[in-house]
Structures are given as structure tokens and as C-alpha cells.
Design a protein with these regions (language model features):
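Extended, Lys/Arg-enriched charged tracts that mediate electrostatic binding to polyanionic substrates
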Residues: 119-140, 226-246
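Short nucleic-acid-contacting surface segments enriched for D/E, G, S/T with interspersed K/R
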Residues: 67-86
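Short, structured beta-strand/loop micro-motifs enriched in basic residues and often containing a Trp
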Residues: 40-69
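Structural detector for short beta-strands of small beta-barrel domains
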Residues: 1-47
Length: 279
């Protein structure tokens, strides 16, 4: 039943030893009525050349709906597993518009393989990466999620900072840090603008929520939440910045939207985009 899936890949097989990073799930193939599962690698040794590649590869295989949550699907590979596989690369006609050309797994030759070269890759992966930035402070790289995490002072208050980067591309680290510094350098202006946008977009909704809160004695009909009050009561808790200069700011809403958070989206180039409640 998986003929349509395997037809997207070249017939030639390559034998490899792969270091699995993690399974990232799969998309549903509506035409073939099956799931396409995907794991990404930390490293691959191509057996014909003995070449070690640390470029992330995507390895895919098809499963039925019943198999998806079994040892044939999500449980087929474990994080940091080293295994010997036979794989086939996707045909150009299917992969030409993709950022990276995936491979399909045609056979698991050996589920667990000893490979000193890939063990060295794994050992290097486990080494912590910490940057000491004079403005942003200590930033620690979460390699699994391609993000640096730290804490900054935003208008005198502690705010969690996340920098979304490509863990394998140090220039992206520099760009994300630069974007965060630009936001921080003009934090008074950005903070005021974000609060004004939230107040403009969400004050009416805040009063609707208040009217439905039976435990709150305040009557929005006679004592409504004003835009000024809403802008004052929210507080920035975390900020996420990409290497391209886009950012997302999360605000605590002082229970005006129960346990939901207020999020503001924007970019350095285009300014603020929108404000929503989420969570």
C-alpha cells in the first residue's frame, strides 16, 4: 500500500550508519491514506566513502494509522540511537522545492551499531555552548530546539530571552544577538508601543471576560477596564527574537484573561504586527 511513497525516491540504495537526533513526527498523506514518519540525524557515515557528515538529514518511512503510535512509528528509533540503514534519496522532481532533500529508509540493517566517529559527534553535541554577552548576559544554547536562552533587564525587570537561531550557523547567532540588542536599546519606545497595541486590540475583550467572571464583583457596565488600565496592568515576562529580526513578546495579563497570556508579534523592520491572547 506504500507504493506511492517509495516511487518518490530513487531506486539506488546507500548504506549508512546514522546517529538519530529525534523523531519529529509525520504528515498525513491523504492520497495514499498513510502517515509519513520523519527522524532527523545528528550525523551520518556513508559506508561507500566512509565520509562523516554532520549536516542534518531527514529520514522518512510510511506507516498506517494503526502503526503510527507503535514500534513501527514513533517508537521505531530512539534519541541518540546509532544504527545501520539502507536509504534512498528523494527524486529531484519531488525534492526540487524543498530546503533539504529527504531520504527514505528502505531497510534497518542493524538497530544498534558501534561507531566511534558518530560517538565523537554525539560527545561534541553534548558539550554545552555558552556565550557571555556584555549586553545580553549569559546565553545558553539549547541544541535540540535551536535557541539560545537567557535573562535580560527590560525597563528594570527580569525578562526571559530566547534567541531563535540555526545551531549549526554561528552567523545566525550574531544576527539574533544584534536584533535583541536593538530592541533592548530602544526598550522604552517598544514597550510603550506594545502596551498601546494590546490596549487598543484587547480592552473590549477584557471587559467581555470581566462580565462573564462571576467571582469578580466589578461591573464592567459601571466600572469598565480602560485602555490605560489594561496597558498598565500587563507585564512583559519573555521575549523571543529571531535571527531575521522578528520577535514575539509574552505579557502576563494580571488575570484579566484568567490564565491566558497576551502575545505581541512584530519585527524591527516592519514594526508591530498584532496582539492576541494565547494559552
Amino acid at each position: 500500500m506504500f507504493e506511492e511513497f517509495y516511487e518518490m525516491y530513487e531506486p539506488e540504495e546507500q548504506e549508512v550508519v546514522a546517529l538519530i537526533n529525534r523523531c519529529i513526527g509525520g504528515g498525513y498523506n491523504w492520497k495514499g491514506n498513510f502517515w509519513e514518519m520523519t527522524v532527523v540525524t545528528l550525523g551520518v557515515v556513508f559506508c561507500d566513502t566512509a565520509k562523516v557528515s554532520t549536516k542534518e538529514e531527514r529520514l522518512e518511512w510510511p506507516v498506517t494509522d494503526e502503526e503510527r503510535n507503535s514500534e513501527k512509528g514513533w517508537e521505531r528509533f530512539q534519541n541518540e540511537q546509532i544504527c545501520r540503514l539502507k536509504i534512498r534519496q528523494m527524486k529531484e522532481e519531488w525534492a526540487k522545492d524543498l530546503v533539504a532533500w529527504p531520504w527514505c529508509i528502505s531497510q534497518v540493517v542493524k538497530a544498534h551499531e558501534d561507531c566511534p566517529e558518530l560517538q565523537a559527534v554525539l560527545d561534541e553535541y553534548h558539550k554545552p555552548v555558552v556565550i557571555q554577552d556584555q549586553v545580553l548576559g549569559e546565553l545558553t544554547l539549547d541544541k535540540d530546539h535551536d535557541v539560545f536562552e537567557g535573562e535580560i533587564q527590560w525597563r528594570g525587570k527580569d525578562v526571559l530571552l530566547s534567541l531563535e537561531v540555526n545551531a549549526e550557523s554561528k552567523p545566525s547567532w550574531t544576527r539574533a544577538r544584534s536584533a535583541a540588542k536593538k530592541l533592548l536599546a530602544d526598550c522604552e519606545t517598544w514597550d510603550k508601543a506594545m502596551r498601546e497595541l494590546v490596549a487598543k486590540n484587547l480592552t473590549e475583550l477584557a471587559n467581555n471576560w470581566l462580565s462573564q467572571d462571576e467571582e469578580n464583583p466589578r461591573d464592567p457596565g459601571t466600572d469598565p477596564i480602560t485602555e490605560e488600565e489594561l496597558a498598565r496592568r500587563i507585564s512583559l515576562t519573555s521575549l523571543s527574537v529571531t535571527s531575521g529580526g522578528s520577535f514575539t513578546a509574552w505579557f502576563d495579563c494580571d488575570e484579566m484573561f484568567t490564565d491566558h497570556a497576551v502575545t505581541v508579534y512584530g519585527s524591527l523592520k516592519k514594526g508591530l504586527k498584532t496582539a492576541n491572547i494565547e494559552g
